[in-house]
Amino acid sequence: LTNFVIVGGGPAGVEMAGALAEFCKYILPKDYPEYPSSIMNIYLIEAIDELLSTMSDKASSKTLTYLKDLNVKVLFNELVSDYDGSEVSTKSGKKILAKNLIWTAGVKGQFPKGIDEKHVVKGNRLKTDSFLKVEGYKNIFAMGDIAAMITTDTPKGHPQVAQTAIQQGKYLGETILNRLRNKPIKPFQYKDKGSLATVGKRKAVADLAKFKFTGYFAWLLWSIVHLMSI
């Protein structure tokens, strides 16, 4: 009952792992001194080799450091293959006893059969050009979570968040109409409003356009944005 397994190393998974770890480290010893904090184990399982894959390398590595400091057990390159309510199984054969499984990994990107796998990049995303056209095809487009428009400014593609899908959806609708009307089209321009993730008490990571920072000030910014959205 005291083992928690979180699946997915995106913002939701990272924030959940940080919150549970903070509870284990600070609240449990204070409110329940009869229970040692060692009885609570927190696992974060990620299918690829990094956390916060759509954020900067700095944000990813710092997040891992924060979680390790909080004694979160981070497992990379692991896929959950089964869960029977008591035990989590991964494709590599690992078994973790846990009554508490929290799924934050979302869903796997799906696309029609026939798409050449050489156009599929990390995260099962389709590589597109600057017009959101899938590379290697004339009339196949991709947008939202499944699209990866890789450029110098976005080496990992755009963030897999609602704002990206909204902007790309609007752009693609206008672009397809302009193509049908033989009108000139412009490449997609993403208006980056920044990415934030909190990793426990007074710790966070922030990617804001050309500015990337971590720690207390990133957490303070996250708190302000969160309060403004309520």
Give the role of each language-model region.
Residues 3, 19-78:
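Rossmann-like dinucleotide-binding cores of NAD(P)H-dependent redox enzymes
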Residues 1, 86-89, 95-167, 174:
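FAD-site-proximal beta/loop scaffold in flavoenzymes
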Residues 43-45, 75, 102, 141-143, ...:
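Hydrophobic/aromatic beta-strand patches that form the interior of the parallel beta-sheet core
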Residues 7, 14, 45, 143-144:
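Active-site flanking residues adjacent to catalytic metal/cofactor-binding acidic residues
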Residues 1-7, 12, 23, 102:
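FAD-binding core/adjacent interface of flavoenzyme oxidoreductases
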Residues 76-87:
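A conserved short coil-to-beta-strand element within the FAD-binding core of flavoproteins
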Residues 164, 168-230:
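C-terminal, flexible cofactor-proximal segment of oxidoreductases
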